[in-house]
Swiss-Prot record:
GO molecular function, one term: 6,7-dimethyl-8-ribityllumazine synthase activity
Keywords linked to the UniProt accession: Riboflavin biosynthesis, Transferase
Membership in a protein family: Belongs to the DMRL synthase family.
Metabolic or biological pathway: Cofactor biosynthesis; riboflavin biosynthesis; riboflavin from 2-hydroxy-3-oxobutyl phosphate and 5-amino-6-(D-ribitylamino)uracil: step 1/2
InterPro entries per UniProt: LS, LS/RS, LS/RS_sf
Protein's UniProt keywords contain Transferase: yes
Protein name as annotated: 6,7-dimethyl-8-ribityllumazine synthase
Residues that, per the record, bind 5-amino-6-(D-ribitylamino)uracil: 23, 57-59, 81-83, 114
Gene name linked to the record: ribH
Record organism: Helicobacter pylori (strain ATCC 700392 / 26695) (Campylobacter pylori)
Length: 156
């Protein structure tokens, strides 16, 4: 039996985009900082890293599709924060963002990591953006790095 998995180390020539929603920027700025930190710590070249900003989480799938279609990137780390409010808006936005991101990843067969927080309140979001529960942006970039490595291994 053979176990095949990715490594948490970049080769240094991977072109990566971080796609970030600006809405709830107090949270998403921290997620983005965590993702950038992870990229640099694991061998990424800052000159090969692009930050792409969109107004809100609903727009993430559309721009992700454009980024993957361009074939400029080896992978994309998607970040956002959707916080439940008093209306069903949260349910619609989180469902469509999640489905759209998954669809684009499968459509282009490209590594994409999901760092979109879906929380019941601002406190939960803050906890996941660098306090009690770690930084989910850092974790999302870690996932992308492993996916990139695994894809290289599977290519042979």
């Amino acid at each position: 039996m053979q176990i095949i998995e990715g490594k948490l180390q970049l080769q240094g020539n991977e072109r990566v985009a971080i796609l970030t929603s600006r809405f709830n920027h107090i949270i998403t700025d921290r997620l983005q900082e965590g993702a950038m930190d992870c990229f640099k710590r694991h061998g990424g070249d800052e000159d090969l890293l692009d930050i792409v900003l969109v107004p809100g989480a609903y727009e993430l799938p559309f721009i992700l599709d454009k980024l993957l279609e361009s074939e400029k990137y080896d992978g994309v780390c998607v970040l956002g924060a959707i916080i439940r409010g008093g209306t069903p808006h949260f349910d619609y936005v989180s469902a469509e963002a999640t489905k759209g991101i998954a669809h684009a990843m499968l459509k282009y067969s490209m590594p994409v990591s999901f760092g979109v927080l879906t929380t019941d309140n601002i406190e939960q979001a803050i906890e996941r953006a660098g306090s009690k529960a770690g930084n989910k942006g850092f974790e999302a970039m870690s996932t992308l790095i492993e996916l990139l490595s695994l894809c290289q291994t599977l290519k042979g």
